[in-house]
């Protein structure tokens, strides 16, 4: 792995080669250590045919930081990779490709279509895993799993069969979210609530055998054909006399009852609600309470079926809507139409308006499974980070409904249920198992269920199916429960809760000890990133760079709303006039870590990435300096540490303790702050400068100079190890160069033990001395700058009011002061000549100005400056003393003027101080 450290830091040159070496070395594998202490993360499996988006990049970077940290800490780490078959998403992609050729899946038939999907999976399934490699992810690739692998498919069957045999899985007719385009039930996660401006139609319903009438309001007039009741509040005096009477349902020959139910809000609208149990989730629950018939009026493609009058049969739902409104108006039963803001449930993949639809599906009794999963969090067996997310979890779990697990798709795990001609269901591993289990003779025809499982069903088994369950494998015993789940808040219910339920039920233990919930990455304006907004950033583009033309093409191709193209192009050109620079994987990873705060929303700005690329560059250049000054030095015990050496070791020690603490609390943002401060502000800006001075100082002994070289080398090694989990590529490259100077070098930095803090390195006195030195040097530099003394010019320094501690610090650091503040002589004198003076921690620093500055000319210049500032102070004071201005101007304008006044007054005081210092 030895490589030259180039003059310039170029991420592209180092990243690919390093990754290939890591993967070839087998260092990512679990079981590489005898340690009984394990650390396991299950990668939330991304869609097999997908590509890496910002959320993936963000979460994968955080997972990799945890894995690399624990691996270097000596634990047996398993990061289990894999991909999800993503039923609906993948089937839609392949269907679109076939449709472009004029072929439907029905033309091919199920078997041939599924073969086509497998072909597509093999063709494009490697994209996301290659992108994971590009970002530096280090999972155990030899254990990669796919949710449709045989082992995982067998686990899905075993799980369902057990649930069925235990009475927790059943087939029933219930209301589901139905996508008429896909002709399948979809999960709540795949429902987008889209804001639309619609209408509210008020219809008149005549009461049977009476002159009375009731007015109801609806946003979906066509559903009135499926009404089974009208509900009123039991305490609504306007209607109590009507409860139990019948309504002549217009446009039909049916009568429906008037019922009383607490669900109805008396004060909303007319206080009367039409009840359509087969086409509304709330109505469905009320229908069950009142034993109302469930009349389905739609087919699976959302046309009206034979349960409606013949006039409406076969009409599309929206055509039927128009016809119903027209017919009600013709009968004089349309009271009024009002504009109404709606939230329309829409399929997030198809854009189709979804329908609550009554259909036979397979369900899992969720309340039974939820109870132990709730208790596990209540008892503290699982910790949510941040803690407040457990409230979201509890809210969902305590109000859980039975889970519809069947989907009307062809791609996925087919439900292991068979039916005879009478419709009886038989559940088993395969047809032979079913016949044996239920004693079915060969002449009894049975047919397998056409449906597949909801993708979340197989995903819920991921923490243990990937480890070999239902077999009791050594891996299952060793790595379950896992250590932490890193995921987004949007799938706490859909995935986290279901893994908890299945983990508790099938493994009798929680699937993970910690659940770290990340925020949502938004753009620099705080907007959610979406293709339709044209503000999506691709992590790989941030790593490798992309031209403006390519970025525009990427953002405007295949838009759902082509009219947005011009707006997207304009915004993109404004934000990225030159395209996106290549920042490298390390800078992108460091940015992700820096953004991982406790916030729910995270604004991503490429300026941050650029800043962290500069950080990497700073580390690279400091490392080059170290190598260039070590010559043939190799770490040895023949050294003596000076005050600056002890200081940087002590600072490193504190930073090391802080990093461990922050990682234990998942405060990645604080980890980056700590490492950034250590590297940039302490090692590079100060210690490297001290080292330059010390190595040129002929008065130092060989042992003392060895102390500097030892510290330069070993502190750099520790910095590289500390930072490696965050910025693995650059730290590996520098380590390979540093190895020549180490006496205990490893093949790769991944084998270096993660640094730990130790009391022996604490040096509070050295820290005090160097803080004192930094204050003195910084003050002297500022003083020189104030009066325009050239940086290259060496000057004298007179010190006054010198306490014993100051003398001690001066003795320890005099060489550094002289070199870093360009001082040629330090004199003790309590009556200095005309000087520029500053007091630092009680010590008076004086720079004699004779021969350096024309004092009279400088005073004249400062007088002019004072006159200008006084004019500004007077002008603003006059404005603020004007009562009319203060009472009439906006608060912000008045506040701005007050700020100006404070600023000018401060500048005036400082300038006057400068003048007085000249005597």
From Swiss-Prot:
Species for this entry: Francisella tularensis subsp. tularensis (strain SCHU S4 / Schu 4)
Gene Ontology MF, one: aminoacyl-tRNA deacylase activity
Matching Gene3D superfamilies: HUPs, Isoleucyl-tRNA Synthetase, Domain 1, Valyl-tRNA synthetase, C-terminal domain, Valyl/Leucyl/Isoleucyl-tRNA synthetase, editing domain
Official protein name in the record: Valine--tRNA ligase
Cited function: Catalyzes the attachment of valine to tRNA(Val). As ValRS can inadvertently accommodate and process structurally similar amino acids such as threonine, to avoid such errors, it has a 'posttransfer' editing activity that hydrolyzes mischarged Thr-tRNA(Val) in a tRNA-dependent manner.
Gene Ontology cellular-component terms listed: cytosol
Catalytic activity: tRNA(Val) + L-valine + ATP = L-valyl-tRNA(Val) + AMP + diphosphate
Lineage of the organism: Bacteria, Pseudomonadati, Pseudomonadota, Gammaproteobacteria, Thiotrichales
HAMAP family, per the entry: Val_tRNA_synth_type1
